[in-house]
Design a protein with these regions (language model features):
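C-terminal catalytic domain of photolyase/cryptochrome flavoproteins
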Residues: 149, 172, 226-229, 234-285
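Short helix-loop capping/hinge motifs at secondary-structure junctions, enriched
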Residues: 20-23, 84-86, 262-264
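A generic secondary-structure signal for well-formed alpha-helical elements
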Residues: 35-36, 112, 136-144, 223, ...
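Acyl-donor binding region in acyl/amide transferases
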Residues: 1-72, 189-257
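Short intrinsically disordered coil segments
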Residues: 29, 91-98, 269-277
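Low-complexity, flexible helical/coil segments
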Residues: 77-82, 114-116, 151-157, 209-213, ...
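Solvent-exposed residues in well-ordered beta-strands and their adjoining turns
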Residues: 17, 80-82, 258-260
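A conserved beta-strand-loop-helix scaffold within acyl/acetyltransferase catalytic domains
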Residues: 1-4, 45-208
Length: 285
């Protein structure tokens, strides 16, 4: 038994009203006990390890005498600082690398008219989405069959998610264009007090200029956003690009929680104990 997680989503924490966390978990665990079927436990993937929701889960499980284990944990890049963008960049990236990025920006500018575009509304949204999907599909993800445009379902998810966010004033889009053609694009979901950097793509023909990194430098403007305290990169742990720019980390984990009667819970104890003893990071996939 597990909570739902779409392959193109990077957080699976249930959406719970502030102050209702304990009540939610109490109701969920009762439901899981009676509706779990043959499942030995409830598996909760992609959960933030810190915060009120996880704390309430642990507290409610303890109050019910129910075993819960964090069976996997990783840390991914997070932007969380009171510094201004320029000051943050200076402390996050060594001087030699900053000099190289300035050189790449200058060289890319020599290829044509370089322009940054930033939108926080639905202007040109349909065209922007088309350009993003084409840009991503033209790269290695397209060759691997993992681009959003490779499947109707993921294309639809992306279009619907961005349209819905834009309608609610929750979408920010950035593009770096060269002579009007996008060479790097990214989409942020703005969800005060946090944000999520959902998807990014770049033109691999210009890889020597690192357009994706150059666009992420512009994305540091999130630090000056009035309602945003942090931004989750939504990237894999140890990501070779964003880990070098965003120095804070967000712990994400997978919890397993005992459900059902005594027999199920005894079997879960044996299973989770064996798995945790084999893996220092917990149970993998």
């Amino acid at each position: 038994l597990r909570t739902w997680l779409h392959p193109n989503c990077f957080a699976a924490a249930p959406l719970v009203a502030k102050g209702c966390e304990r009540a939610f978990w109490a109701a969920f665990l009762v439901w899981a006990d009676t509706n779990g079927g043959p499942a030995l436990f409830a598996h909760l993937p992609e959960m933030p390890v810190d915060g009120a929701l996880a704390a309430a889960l642990r507290a409610e499980a303890a109050a019910q005498g129910r075993r819960i284990e964090l069976v996997y944990r990783e840390e991914r890049a997070l932007l969380d600082s009171d510094l201004a963008p320029a000051d943050y960049l200076e402390q996050a990236v060594r001087g030699k690398k900053r000099k190289e990025l300035r050189r790449q920006h200058a060289r890319l500018s020599e290829e044509g008219k370089l322009k940054l575009e930033r939108y926080d509304d639905d202007r040109c949204l349909a065209t922007w989405i088309d350009h993003f999907l084409a840009l991503e599909a033209a790269g290695w993800k397209g060759a691997a069959g993992s681009a959003l445009a490779a499947h109707d379902a993921t294309t639809g998810l992306f279009r619907d998610a961005l349209r819905g966010a834009a309608e609610r004033g929750r979408l920010e889009r950035l593009s770096l264009t060269l002579d009007g053609r996008p060479v790097a694009m990214l989409a942020n979901f703005i969800t005060p007090p946090g944000a999520f950097s959902y998807k990014t793509a770049f033109d691999e023909r210009f890889a020597r200029f690192s357009p994706g990194v150059l666009l992420q430098l512009e994305n540091l403007a999130l630090l000056e956003h009035d309602t945003i305290a942090w931004c989750d990169s939504c990237a894999a742990a140890d990501h070779p690009m964003i880990d070098g720019l965003w120095t804070e980390r967000r712990a994400i984990g997978r919890y397993s929680v005992a459900i059902g009667g005594a027999a199920k819970r005894a079997a879960f104890d044996r299973l989770v104990g064996a798995e945790l003893s084999r893996s220092p990071r917990g149970i993998g996939d």
